């Protein structure tokens, strides 16, 4: 796509507040000057809003004030007028179980913050899972020039010589305690080893996935996704972003120019290549809706099919984001997609050029972290959409984190009516369950458990774990953390609380999962299903 920059100079949006000698203009300038701002900042230069999701209750974002100052430096260097504006910071851990619900509230707040105040362009400082989609949703709705800057992942974790991934090892250690393989005291000892620095999860969880998604969409400078939070190059990225947004305002390069259907195809294929979170499905559909780009669940299945998962990171593989950065980061992965004919190379980015121009010179410096296609974790790594009488509107599964032997499975259902029922019974030694069963949990969707909580990766019962079993087929209308793993069917739709077929499943019914044929079937009669 060829972008034609707007003419410069021209009158900007902010001048509706600041230009001239009217009472309103003097009112606006006067109040701003109480911060010690010189008069020439109001001379028509671009006003850049730095939307900052800093919060000490959001550990992924607790370092963003430093990055905000670096963006500010960059804006000044490019001749702009920077203003730091705090916006709603949604922490996945802090807002459990309703974080998804607050994503939408945050998106609305961001949209109104931009619409209601005197900005010509925005830089969105994001980190934790929901902050990235919420800020991009809000900014896309207003459609002013926008760049995203991620806070970056935390450093690798280590415990007793073992590489430890945030989130992923929380689930593993928790299961080990239930299986009697780890003491509660050791679990607590491992706690500090998981989180050694500021930043988001060091696995390919939802935060790193969404950082990768906005880079693949073209909404960040190239290389944004993987730079560790405490690496000095993260600060450089922020400062360069501050410089770039000023030129974007002058050129009038907006999200609607960048967020095309071709850009979303690039992002969905990137998600397959990195083994990204199932939560990206929900977020990208929402972002596309805000910008008016047609995007469906079927697009996810169609575009991700036959894209190999080449990024060997937890929870699907063995490495962490720090190694991913050293190996070449996301530009190297996008380049590999381009070489395989799986990239819309001329899709526009915030640079003003095509994505291929940004990645064509990228290098892969560790081919055990970024694998060759013939050694991929899975040859078809895209998010799978299964349908059938149990999920007429679809359900999703992440193949890179699933057990191959369970991708074709028929088993007896063990049903939990909701999360409380699950918690009450899962450790009961008399529970009639073994590893061949299919665990089913109802009423955890958007209505049933407001916020569609990340509880779909139900922990296995202790008596199964003690056999050395680490995975079973699990089905729910919930979400799961991007750091989690297993043969887990999620987002089953319609959800149980809306009267979807999931609501009628009973313990003892048989369920068939057939990933290759995209089928999820409840083995009961049509009459029973309708009743």
Language model feature labels by segment:
Residues 2-62, 69-88, 93, 99, ...:
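Catalytic or ion-coupling anion/metal-binding cores of large enzyme and transporter domains
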Residues 102:
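Glycine-rich phosphate- or other oxyanion-binding loops that anchor nucleotides, phosphorylated ligands
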Residues 114-135, 146-150:
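A short, small-residue-rich loop immediately preceding and capping a beta-strand
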């Amino acid at each position: 796509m060829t972008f034609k920059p707007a003419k410069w100079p021209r009158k900007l949006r902010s001048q509706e507040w600041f230009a001239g000698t009217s009472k309103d203009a003097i009112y606006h300038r006067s109040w701003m000057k109480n911060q010690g701002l010189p008069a020439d900042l109001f001379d028509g230069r671009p006003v850049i809003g730095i939307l900052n999701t800093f919060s000490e209750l959001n550990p992924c974002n607790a370092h963003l004030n430093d990055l905000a100052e670096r963006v500010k430096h960059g804006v000044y260097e490019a001749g702009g007028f920077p203003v730091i504006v705090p916006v709603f910071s949604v922490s996945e851990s802090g807002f459990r179980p309703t974080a998804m619900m607050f994503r939408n509230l945050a998106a609305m707040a961001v949209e109104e913050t931009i619409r209601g105040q005197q900005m010509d362009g925005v830089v969105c400082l994001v980190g934790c899972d929901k902050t990235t989609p919420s800020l991009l949703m809000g900014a896309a709705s207003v459609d002013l020039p926008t760049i995203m800057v991620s806070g970056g992942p935390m450093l690798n974790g280590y415990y007793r010589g073992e590489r430890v991934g945030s989130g992923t090892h929380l689930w593993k250690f928790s299961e080990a305690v239930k299986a009697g393989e780890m003491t509660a005291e050791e679990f607590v000892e491992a706690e500090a080893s998981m989180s050694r620095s500021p930043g988001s999860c060091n696995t390919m969880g939802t935060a790193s996935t969404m950082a990768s998604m906005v880079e693949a969409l073209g909404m960040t400078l190239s290389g944004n996704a993987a730079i560790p939070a405490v690496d000095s190059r993260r600060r450089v990225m922020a400062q360069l972003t501050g410089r770039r947004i000023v030129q974007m305002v002058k050129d009038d390069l907006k999200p609607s120019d960048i967020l095309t259907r071709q850009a979303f195809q690039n992002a969905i294929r990137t998600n397959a290549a990195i083994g990204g979170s199932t939560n990206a499905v929900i977020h990208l559909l929402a972002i596309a809706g805000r910008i008016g780009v047609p995007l469906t669940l079927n697009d996810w299945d169609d575009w991700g099919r036959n894209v190999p998962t080449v990024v060997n990171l937890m929870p699907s593989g063995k490495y962490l984001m720090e190694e991913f950065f050293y190996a070449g980061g996301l530009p190297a992965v996008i380049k590999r997609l381009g070489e395989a004919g799986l990239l819309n190379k001329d899709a526009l980015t915030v640079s003003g050029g095509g994505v291929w121009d940004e990645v064509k010179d990228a290098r892969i410096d560790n081919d055990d972290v970024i694998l060759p296609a013939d050694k991929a974790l899975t040859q078809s790594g895209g998010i799978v959409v299964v349908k059938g009488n149990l999920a007429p509107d679809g359900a999703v599964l992440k193949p890179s984190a699933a057990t191959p032997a369970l991708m074709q499975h028929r088993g007896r259902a063990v049903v939990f009516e909701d999360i409380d029922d699950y918690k009450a019974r899962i450790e009961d030694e008399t529970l009639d369950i073994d590893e061949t069963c299919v665990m089913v949990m109802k009423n955890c969707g958007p209505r049933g458990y407001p916020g569609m909580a990340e509880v779909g990766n139900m922990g296995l019962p202790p008596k199964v774990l003690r056999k050395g079993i680490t995975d079973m087929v699990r089905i729910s209308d919930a979400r799961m953390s991007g750091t989690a793993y297993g043969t887990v069917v999620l987002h089953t739709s319609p959800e149980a609380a809306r009267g979807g077929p999931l609501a009628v499943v009973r313990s003892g019914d048989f369920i068939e999962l057939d990933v290759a044929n995209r089928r999820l079937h409840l083995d009961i009669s049509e009459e029973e299903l309708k009743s």
